[in-house]
Amino acid sequence: MSPAKRWGSPCLFPLQLFSLCWVLSVAQSKTVRYSTFEEDAPGTVIGTLAEDLHMKVSGDTSFRLMKQFNSSLLRVREGDGQLTVGDAGLDRERLCGPSPQCVLAFDVVSFSQEQFRLVHVEVEVRDVNDHAPRFPRAQIPVEVSESAPVGTRIPLEVPVDEDVGANGLQSVRLAEPHSPFRVELQTRADGAQCADLVLLQELDRESQASYSLELVAQDGGRPPRSATAALSVRVLDANDHSPAFPQGAVAEVELAEDAPVGSLLLDLDAADPDEGPNGDVVFTFGARTPPEARHLFRLDPRSGRLTLAGQVDYERQDTYELDVRAQDRGPGPRTATCKVIVRIRDVNDNAPEISITPLAAPGAPATSPFAAAAAAAALGGADAASSTGSGTQEAGITSLVPEGAARESLVALVSTSDRDSGANGQVRCALYGHEHFRLQPAYAGSYLVVTAASLDRERIAEYNLTLVAEDRGTPPLRTVRPYTVRVGDENDNAPIFTKPVYEVSVRENNPPGAYLATVAARDPDVGRNGQVTYRLVEAEVGRSGEAVSTYVSVDPATGAIYALRSFDYETLRQLDVRVQASDGGSPQLSSNALVQVRVLDQNDHSPILVHPAPANGSLEVAVPGRSTKDTAVARIQARDADEGANGELAFDLLQQEPREAFSIGRHTGEIMLTGDLSQEPPGRVFKALLVISDGGRPPLTTTATVSFVVTAGGGSAVPASSGSPEHSRPPGSRLAPSGPSLQWDTPLIVIIVLAGSCTLLLAAIIAIATTCNRRKKEVRKGGALREERPGAAGGGASAPGSPDETARGTGPRPNMFDVLTFPGSGKAPFGSPAADAPPPAVAAAEVPGSEGGSATGESACHFEGQQRLRGAHAEPYGASPGFGKEPAAPPVAVWKGHSFNTISGREAEKFSGKDSGKGDSDFNDSDSDISGDALKKDLINHMQSGLWACTAECKILGHSDRCWSPSCAGPNVHPPPHPPAQMSTFCKSTSLPRDPLRRDNYYQAQLPKTVGLQSVYEKVLHRDYDRTVTLLSPPRPGRLPDLQEIGVPLYESPPGSRYVSPKKGINENV
């Protein structure tokens, strides 16, 4: 349109121009800028012109657009010029497209009465990330030549993002991080974006003809939005020239030593632009490539890829040189050579190695445990040195260290090594397991295992330690090796008894060989150091001065203690035995324990009548004829050597004839008159059986016949004692209580005391005279004892059964089991009627050594009588007269060696030490020489003297008891007219050692079970080599083969009884 047409006619132009200038001068024009985000909701207020222009709004003010504008985008309110988003909303991509800025500009006119104003409004629509990038195609194919050098760029289609600025496309990348390509996004000068696929490494179509990759496009919004597309890269062949290595003549590559087999070292892509066979390239190693390298590396002849074929080791070789030759297959093949240098990079692939060398104890022999442990440790150390570290070495090493080793003592040498280099080969070592050991650095890579404290095998016998070696690589490798230290035992602990004092109780009259107790000691050491043996500590027992080893014996292996003799409570109340426990170490250690053997009292003593003194088992009490009822007639006093209930006495009067006229206090012993004797004539005799019993179980009793003679006088009915009973009883004996004391006046007490003193003096004079007379007879008769007994009726004839009559063979032979009744004992012969009834009055026979006493007409061995067998009046068994604490017996003849000696009944104990209760045949405790040579000489002398009774049967059946029994043949010129009678002895007949199959089993309950017990057993059973035989009857001449066989009684303890009694019916030959 021409200017004339645009402005009207030429004449009107100046007027219009003037009007416009006037309007512009009158109107106040201004530009207002607003901004809003796309996608804001319709009706969103963008701004108010009246407020922003500071205009006074009146009723006639209005705002209008200068020209028509799309009201669906923006709206202007007339009243105040408020701008709001239209109903269609604002879409920046639709309004402005890819423009960096999107501004909506328009003019608004404000009318009012005062003025006219033109306002230029600019509304900037800001972008919102409401669109994600998108690729033009989901599959994007790309072709690249295999000869393309590294860095080759291949254009790619750029993804589209309708947003702009930061919300637009920001990056394009490959999802595979290790692909040979990279995508680069660039912006050109005109602002357009382009994407290139960059080749990162050379391609080899023969090894990989295509790559399937994934492209990822992403914008910069918050949060960002992305899109993906598949990228297919096809490698094109190019082979129209001679092969050419892109690396040149020399190529270097670095390879980690832990690279897996098959890893690609280098792709020797020798380019040949020819096609077909001319471009078909074959790759081979050159002639100068070493054989070792050919085994470790592989070259693909078609692709030229150099890969790893074997495991490399930096510690063995760190560099390899390979000659690679490329040759095409065309006529007149062309070749190219490339030297490939492969450098091995060290990695931490070797764990540290630990070598342990234990040290033997100084001076230990080759066969000692220390040397053996050292040899085993050296072998284990060699194995460890030859192995490759595997992280944990299972083979353990054992060291042996004595428990007496001082602190800081060397135990073992530890050496560490690592075949890696640098920090990978630097090793640090630590010792774990116990604070008693520690590591002490020695020199580079070596440490010393030393003791950090004193060792005690009894507390900890073995230490399980752990050696840990770790290098300084990344990540570090470590080796863990178990290490055992055994503590060698030393004899540093003495045996310890379970308790220091053992209290043992044993009843007296125990059988020799009886088990007493067992002491136990423990030694925490091992081996010989912990082997405990027991022995007795020698000491003297009591006043006798005998060694304690003659009383008891201890088993050295088990500590069992056995009695070697029978204990007597009345002579030994307690036996203190010290037992020493010693180990087998060197030096030997020992400790002692005290064994207190308390002997318990047993009812083995019968009551003894003290006052009035009995005569031949009878008492005679004078009773005044005018005595009235309840008059004290006499007081009986008795004693019992036992204690406690065993010594409590009770009195009884039984079998009173012709009537019961007397009673006795059961505990006082006082005899009272219970009837009236005024009508009895003088000389009338009342008889009663006095029974004195103790409180033992079973009780022992003593009986005596009491004759009460009625006298005409009226004197005291209580007879005077010939001696004070208090002075006559032995120490330790008990007197029966005397009951209520009688009322004596002073003159009577003086008379009784003077009479008692005179009686004691007279008794002492008689005893001395009798002893002197007996010794003169023994010297004059050569030790042969004869007892002369005047006949009760006629005078000079010997009583039946007397020793003289027995010696001449005219009297009855004495029974071996008869009981000799000594003066005052009141005992009846064994098997005689008097054993069951009160003894009748018999004629007294004078016996040397006794005064006014009488004996029975028979003499026999002092074994148990029939009353003992019945158990009602049991008495202890005695091996000789007086053994059971009885009154002194008449002298007897003793055969010792080849002669006879005359001794008293009480003295027989000294000559028969093996039956006197002294104990075992210990050193210096034998009646004769019991050494081996002495026994041989004694046996040979017996054989030469014809003292053996062996027969032809002995060679077939073995020796019998008669072969071992002592001979009774003595020097007597009067041979007996008949075969010799069996001898009677006061001692138990025992046999010398003989065939074990014929051994007499006296104490089968104490059979030995160990070597120590066997020695005890033999001590008890075979200590009779020099046994002395005490004979009652004198010896008679005659050869031993002509004598009858000797009857040897066997003894066994009946059930429920601890008393030994002879068995009936075994008086035949054994």
From Swiss-Prot:
Location within or outside the cell: Cell membrane; Cell projection, Dendrite; Presynaptic cell membrane; Postsynaptic cell membrane
Family matches, as SMART domains: CA (SM00112)
Keywords tagged on the record: Calcium, Cell adhesion, Cell membrane, Cell projection, Glycoprotein, Membrane, Phosphoprotein, Postsynaptic cell membrane, Repeat, Signal, Synapse, Transmembrane, Transmembrane helix
Extracellular side: 30-747
Residue numbers carrying Phosphoserine: 1053
A GO term, aspect molecular function: calcium ion binding
Membrane topology classification: Single-pass type I membrane protein
Ranges annotated as spanning the membrane: 748-768
Record region (Disordered): 716-740, 777-859, 906-928, 1046-1070
Signal peptide: 1-29
Pfam families documented for this protein: Cadherin, Cadherin_2
Residues bearing attached sugar chains per UniProt: 616
Listed Basic and acidic residues bias regions: 780-790, 906-921
Domain of life: Eukaryota
Stretches with biased composition (Low complexity): 716-725
InterPro entries given in the database record: Cadherin-like_dom, Cadherin-like_sf, Cadherin_CS, Cadherin_N, Protocadherin/Cadherin-CA
Gene Ontology cellular component annotations, sorted alphabetically: dendrite; glutamatergic synapse; plasma membrane; postsynaptic membrane; presynaptic membrane; Schaffer collateral - CA1 synapse
Keyword Transmembrane helix: yes
Segments forming domain Cadherin: 30-135, 136-245, 247-354, 393-497, 498-609, 615-721
Subunit structure comment from the entry: The N-terminal extracellular domain forms homophilic interactions; these interactions activate p38 MAPK via TAOK2 and trigger endocytosis. Interacts with CDH2; this interaction may lead to CDH2 cointernalization. Interacts with CDH11. Interacts with TAOK2.
Annotated function: Calcium-dependent cell-adhesion protein. May play a role in activity-induced synaptic reorganization underlying long term memory. Could be involved in CDH2 internalization through TAOK2/p38 MAPK pathway. In hippocampal neurons, may play a role in the down-regulation of dendritic spines, maybe through its action on CDH2 endocytosis.
UniProt protein name: Protocadherin-8
Native species: Mus musculus (Mouse)
